[in-house]
UniProtKB/Swiss-Prot annotation:
It comes from the Bacteria. The gene is rsmB. GO terms for cellular component: cytosol. It is found in: Cytoplasm. This is Ribosomal RNA small subunit methyltransferase B. Specifically methylates the cytosine at position 967 (m5C967) of 16S rRNA. It comes from Salmonella dublin (strain CT_02021853). One of its GO terms (biological process) is regulation of DNA-templated transcription. Residues 400-412 have a biased composition (Polar residues).
């Protein structure tokens, strides 16, 4: 089997599993990448991410160019045609190669009889491309987001929703966190320059560096030795607001994959940290991160709603709750989120967040700090959540972040800045 020929069909199968079966791309893609040569892995990733980023447009084009949708066992061909459109619109793959390889993909998915159909649709698109794209530019699909999410963003951000959508449709910058126990940020930036790369410090987060051009981690000075970690700037804000101190008992709840756990220990190496997550499989990445950075923490599997099951009656000086959320602030990194989430999920997530907040608040010592964080931009999960929590929790007070009417700090995704993130810093009276 020609691996190069198979690339397009693998991408089509990955997108189908996300859209039709509700699988996350981070679970679907790695096993498929094992089926292609190393030199082809980047292209496979680009095709999967790109098709999911522009899915609304590609779906719109198929509806314009085909009289009826592909269904049943032929459904993968629907996504194979999308992969073809994406290459013609957004990649440097020569058009003749894009067509030939995509058409050949029908053989890999055991649909060789549909090669002529695929070829015909792609060539029809080439002939009508300018007219079709002009029409698309005035359609509702042009936002590249599901309609329910566009409406929620319009309601929440009447003057900024388009900026958020544009940011979500861009490729994300690559942010790093310099391990302050090994190097100062300026010192590591010097090592980066010596390696022929350039980075820029974040003005607000003292460990954050943005690479001018994304690079593989093995090319970063000292990555294997734990000198630096890949972590978005906004995610680094969690430890900044938490302000952990040596000797404190700290709970990092919903901790996987461990980026925030290790950041806490970089800021306060002698803190006693308990990292808890409900997903046992993802906890393996917490262990991996601790090992790479040479750090120690207690790691437990547990549900945030039932702290007695994983910490008994223990109380903590500080709690970081990176709550389960819609992840609508990190769509540019995970474009599958747009198609995995449903409108009804938001109410269910807000209810879960409230239950976890109420369950862990008694575990915070008087005078202690709880930082509530999400990678969402939706008020129901953020400001509204904290506002109602403050109303029902008389011993909770807001600190540093916002006002009682507008509690918390909301970062919006954009350009070279960090992802969409929300933080609220609460003090126990």
């Amino acid at each position: 089997m020609k691996k190069q020929n198979n690339l397009r069909s693998l991408a089509a199968q990955a997108v189908e599993q996300v859209v039709e079966q509700g699988q996350s791309l981070s679970n679907v893609l790695p096993p498929l990448q094992q089926k292609v040569a190393d030199k082809d892995k980047a292209l496979l990733q680009e095709l999967c991410f790109g098709v999911l980023r522009t899915l609304s447009q590609l779906e719109w084009l198929i509806n314009k160019l085909m009289s009826r949708p592909m269904t049943g066992k032929q459904r993968t061909v629907h996504y194979l045609i999308m992969v073809g459109f994406y290459q013609l619109l957004y990649t440097r793959v020569p058009p003749h190669a894009a067509l030939a390889e995509t058409v050949e993909g029908a053989v890999s998915i055991k649909r060789p009889q549909l090669k002529g159909l695929i070829n015909g649709v792609l060539r029809q698109f080439q002939r009508q491309q300018e007219t079709l794209l002009n029409e698309f530019a005035t359609s509702d699909a042009r936002f590249l987001h599901p309609g329910w999410l566009v409406k929620r963003l319009q309601n929440a951000y009447p003057t900024q929703w388009q900026r958020i959508i544009e940011a979500n449709n861009q490729r994300p910058p690559m942010w790093l966190r310099v391990n302050r126990t090994h190097h100062t940020r300026d010192g590591w930036l010097g090592l980066l320059e010596d390696a022929g790369m350039k980075g820029y410090p974040h003005p607000d987060y003292p460990d954050a560096v943005r690479l001018e051009t994304p690079a593989p981690v093995h090319a970063l000075p000292g990555f294997a030795e734990g000198w630096v970690t890949v972590q978005d700037a906004s995610a680094q804000g969690c430890a900044v607001f938490l302000a952990p101190q040596n000797g404190e008992h700290i709970l990092d709840l919903c901790s996987a994959p461990g980026g925030k756990t290790t950041h806490i220990l970089e800021v306060a190496p002698e803190a006693d940290v308990l990292a808890v997550d409900i997903d046992e499989q993802r906890l393996s990445r917490v262990y991996d991160n601790l090992k790479r950075l040479g750090m120690k923490a207690t790691v437990k599997q547990g549900d945030g709603r039932y702290p007695a099951q994983w910490c008994g009656e223990q109380q903590f000086d500080r709690i970081l709750l990176d709550a389960p959320c819609s992840a609508t602030g990190v769509i540019r990194r995970h474009p599958d989120i747009k198609w995995l989430r449903r409108d009804r999920d938001i109410v269910e997530l807000a209810q879960l967040q409230a239950e976890i907040l109420d369950a862990v608040w008694p575990r915070l010592k008087p005078g202690g700090t709880l930082v509530y964080a999400t990678c969402s931009v939706l008020p129901e999960e953020n400001r509204d959540q904290i506002k109602t929590f403050l109303q029902r929790t008389p011993d909770a007070a807001l600190s540093e972040t916002g006002t009682p009417d507008q509690p918390g700090q909301q970062n919006l995704p954009g350009g070279e800045e960090g992802d969409g993130f929300f933080y609220a810093k609460l003090i126990k009276k």
